Amino acid sequence: MKFELLNQVNLKKDHEIRIYSTCIGCTQCVRACPTDVLEMVPSTTCKAKQVVTVPRIEDCVGCKRCESACPTDFLSIRVYLGGETLRSMGLAY
């Protein structure tokens, strides 16, 4: 399975949220978010015909509850804080 980046939203230089093509449109991450940052939008990339998006990034507190709620093997939504991005993707040297 190919993991494509669907959306990347940067709040600050050191804080970003990435949405991957493995999103199945289940809404678990949306329901888990304590600050209502996420919402579902129509899409043809999954069977549920919807994927998550991040319209209110400025309200993200970096709690990563959306990651914990994601049922896919390859987390469809990831929150990166600081230098965490390269390390967590196995790309740091």
Swiss-Prot record:
Catalytic activity: reduced [plastocyanin] + hnu + oxidized [2Fe-2S]-[ferredoxin] = oxidized [plastocyanin] + reduced [2Fe-2S]-[ferredoxin]
The keyword Iron-sulfur is annotated on this UniProt entry: yes
GO cellular component, one term: chloroplast thylakoid membrane
Keywords: 4Fe-4S, Chloroplast, Electron transport, Iron, Iron-sulfur, Membrane, Metal-binding, Oxidoreductase, Photosynthesis, Photosystem I, Plastid, Repeat, Thylakoid, Transport
Residues given in the record as [4Fe-4S] cluster 2 binding sites: 33, 60, 63, 66
Enzyme Commission number: 1.97.1.12
Required cofactor(s): [4Fe-4S] cluster
Gene3D superfamilies associated with the record: 3.30.70.20
GO biological-process terms attached to the record: photosynthetic electron transport in photosystem I
Binding of [4Fe-4S] cluster 1, residues: 23, 26, 29, 70
Domain of life: Eukaryota
Cofactor note: Binds 2 [4Fe-4S] clusters. Cluster 2 is most probably the spectroscopically characterized electron acceptor FA and cluster 1 is most probably FB.
Database matches in InterPro entries: 4Fe4S_Fe-S-bd, 4Fe4S_Fe_S_CS, PSI_iron-sulfur_center, PSI_PsaC
Primary location recorded for the protein, binned into one broad class: plastid
GO MF term set: 4 iron, 4 sulfur cluster binding; electron transfer activity; metal ion binding; oxidoreductase activity
Assembly notes: The eukaryotic PSI reaction center is composed of at least 11 subunits.
Function, as annotated: Apoprotein for the two 4Fe-4S centers FA and FB of photosystem I (PSI); essential for photochemical activity. FB is the terminal electron acceptor of PSI, donating electrons to ferredoxin. The C-terminus interacts with PsaA/B/D and helps assemble the protein into the PSI complex. Required for binding of PsaD and PsaE to PSI. PSI is a plastocyanin-ferredoxin oxidoreductase, converting photonic excitation into a charge separation, which transfers an electron from the donor P700 chlorophyll pair to the spectroscopically characterized acceptors A0, A1, FX, FA and FB in turn.
Name of the protein this chain belongs to: Photosystem I iron-sulfur center
Recorded name of the encoding gene: psaC
